[in-house]
Amino acid sequence: MKDEQLYYFEKSSVFKGMMHFSVPMMIGSLLSVIYGILNIYFIGFLGDSHMISAISLTLPIFAVLMGLGNLFGIGGGTYISRLLGAKDYVKTKFVSSFSIYGGLILGVIVILMTIFATEQIAHLLGARGETLGFTSAYLKVMFLSAPFVILFFILEQFARSIGAPIISMIGMLASVVLNIILDTILIFGFDLNVVGAALGTAISNVVASLFFIIYFLRKSDIITMSLSYVRPTKEILVEIFKVGFPAFLMSILMGVTGLVLNLFLAGYGNFAIASYGISFRLVQFPELIIMGLCEGVVPLIAYNFMSDKARMKNIIKVVIMTIVVIFAVCMVIVFTTGHQLIGIFSNDAAIVGMATFMLKVTMTSLLLNGIGFLFTGMLQATGQGRGATIMAILQGVVIIPVLFVMNGLFGLTGIVWSLLIAETICALAAMLIVYLLRDRLTVDKAELLEG
């Protein structure tokens, strides 16, 4: 392991180390949000709402592919970070090689299971009429690219786990920029509409994966793709999946949650869906900054969990303070200029009014959301698979009964407030789980929670 990487893991100031690992993740997350908006923006130029709906309906499938990548990426990545903290540089090769080829095999399985059933899957996602054909076409390209989508998530996580977050950011940046360029060429130049958008995403993932592969082959003696190291032991399997499975489950349940929420909103018409769509995109900016912050420090927490628990506690304190500052700034902006922000996306008075209300409520949940991200990250980083699994289930499931109750009592307003209620429950549960497991994390965890 290079001295520069060890410096940020062990010797730099807590804030400097946190920024080194988290800023690339935050930038990469924001680029993904921007890309998502631009993707819809480009398709919107074609003037066909069915195409826009098709892309939106495929989001749960993307969540599944991301979850499969996280299974080995987060599971293997956090284990690699813990092995580096324990100075076990040989076992990292076995973990990385097994994770990479395991992810590729999962991708091939996805292709075999789905490629001849895209229309049926599109129908299950809610596609009807003209939207069905566009959704099926988009899904076909998405499924064919599954091995590289999964591989991209694995390799990006591995770059961060070995202390190379800048490389992770470059890979994500290259993917997003190439995606935007290809969208423009394929959608408009070749008139491929949604298929062009899907191909742009697929090709960009292939290129980004190749970038990571070349980097690891040339620069890393920790991550390997050699088949000779694909020898999973019981210990390796347990350590990868006890952290990776909760991350996988979280992605799956987030996709299910989004699908259920859309079904509830659909009962109030397009105005409700459009209003939530706008507010959701705006909330995503600070939310993904915080998510990037929390995900970025996972390797730092994992490393110091093995070597310096006092430093780990300080890292967690600094992250919490940073989340509070981000939350405060966002609340001031939303409550002073929220109406104007929504107006950028729509001039419909009803949509602007409802979206502004949704924005204020959902932004209020940002602090609790951030705490949930951090404590779940702590559980992942320290190998507490059972606690992380419970959190993953709660974050995906709690919202559903809350939606039923609040919708029945208060209608659309209740649906909006259900988001804040669910985040409150999950944040409290996360703090309780970490408190109960405090002896397995660090003896100072109780003091941290009380403080």
Swiss-Prot record:
Q: Which terms are listed as keywords in the entry?
A: Antibiotic resistance, Cell membrane, Membrane, Transmembrane, Transmembrane helix, Transport
Q: Where in the cell is it found?
A: Cell membrane
Q: State any GO CC term.
A: plasma membrane
GO BP: any one term: response to antibiotic
Which residue spans traverse the membrane?
26-46, 54-74, 98-118, 134-154, 162-182, 194-214, 245-265, 282-302, 315-335, 355-375, 397-417, 418-438
Looking at the record's lineage, which domain of life comes first?
Answer: Bacteria
Protein topology in the membrane: Multi-pass membrane protein
**MF GO annotations:** antiporter activity; xenobiotic transmembrane transporter activity
| Main location per the UniProt record | membrane
Q: What InterPro entries does this protein's entry cite? A: MATE_fam, MATE_MepA-like, MATE_MepA_subfamily, MdtK-like
Q: Which CDD domains match?
A: MATE_MepA_like
| Family recorded in the similarity comment | Belongs to the multi antimicrobial extrusion (MATE) (TC 2.A.66.1) family. MepA subfamily.
> Function, please?
Multidrug resistance efflux protein.
- Protein name in the entry: Multidrug export protein MepA
Query: What are the leading ranks of the lineage?
Result: Bacteria, Bacillati, Bacillota, Bacilli, Bacillales
This protein's encoding gene = mepA
